[in-house]
Amino acid sequence: MNINKIALIYNQNSKHLAIIEEIKKLYNYCKIEEAEAIIVIGGDGELLHNIHRYMNLNIPFYGVNLGSLGFLMNPLDTKNLLQNIHESTVSILNPLLMQAEDISGQIYTALAINEVSIFRKTNQAAKFRIDVNGIERMSELVADGALVATPAGSSAYNLSAGGPILPLDSNMLCLTPICSFRPRRWHGALLLSSATIKFEILNTNKRPVNATADFQEFNNITNVTVKSTKDKPIKLLFNKNHTLEDRIIKEQFGG
């Protein structure tokens, strides 16, 4: 990629400031608003927070992993950092758009890159109805919660909850229960990315439920609607020999 203006973002309280200082010496970085690419140093959480913060700028992000897992990041390679960016490949992620209503009638909207989840707020299991494209598909699910994951997010919380990993270009979404009690053997569904999923919370007084879109949490929710949106495409840059597609395939074989 022909990228000449690069911005740098990192956590000022990072325990890796010595490494970050070395990276800062490599290039004359510009302001974020002027950049053609944004380098984010840290882990997946740091990258997700900054994507949410700057996604409206429509600038590609290149993550450098100094965290733990770093699934959406590139490995640290200080010596070849700029060359790797120039030779990088682009993965386009379409986030989820969540609309949630709480018990007071307040409406919240949020975007999620990985997943939208709903989960019980107390020791009582959650109860909710599931509609897909306006058609009731499950009259009552009793569980700790449920989530809708994008292909990029399918290897995160979704995988831990027992959901499948989706290829990045699959145009599918995962609908996965979290510790389903009834129906006990239901393991979720694979839906087209064009689907609109609605969760209607049952018995909200006795069984309160919260909802999250990535790291954004909303309390005492009565219903949640989730759908994929192409209005806010997110561009992630990956080293040519370390693409996100390859990582998703590797994850399916325990890599």
UniProtKB/Swiss-Prot annotation:
Annotated compartments: Cytoplasm
Keyword terms of this UniProt record: ATP-binding, Cytoplasm, Kinase, NAD, NADP, Nucleotide-binding, Transferase
Record EC number: 2.7.1.23
InterPro entries, per database record: ATP-NAD_kinase_N, ATP-NAD_kinase_PpnK-typ_C, NAD/diacylglycerol_kinase_sf, NADK
Binding site for NAD(+): D44, G45, H49, N114, E115, D144, A152, S155, A156, Y157, N158, L159, S160, Q216
Active site: D44 (proton acceptor)
A molecular-function term among this protein's GO annotations: ATP binding
Transmembrane regions listed in the UniProt entry: none
GO cellular component: cytoplasm
One BP term from GO: NADP biosynthetic process
Broad class of the protein's primary localization: cytoplasm
Cofactor(s) demanded: a divalent metal cation
Superkingdom, taxonomy of origin: Bacteria
Catalysed reactions listed for this entry: NAD(+) + ATP = ADP + NADP(+) + H(+)
NCBIfam families assigned: PRK04761.1
Family classification: Belongs to the NAD kinase family.
Function: Involved in the regulation of the intracellular balance of NAD and NADP, and is a key enzyme in the biosynthesis of NADP. Catalyzes specifically the phosphorylation on 2'-hydroxyl of the adenosine moiety of NAD to yield NADP.
Listed name of the protein: NAD kinase
Highest classification ranks of the organism: Bacteria, Pseudomonadati, Pseudomonadota, Alphaproteobacteria, Rickettsiales
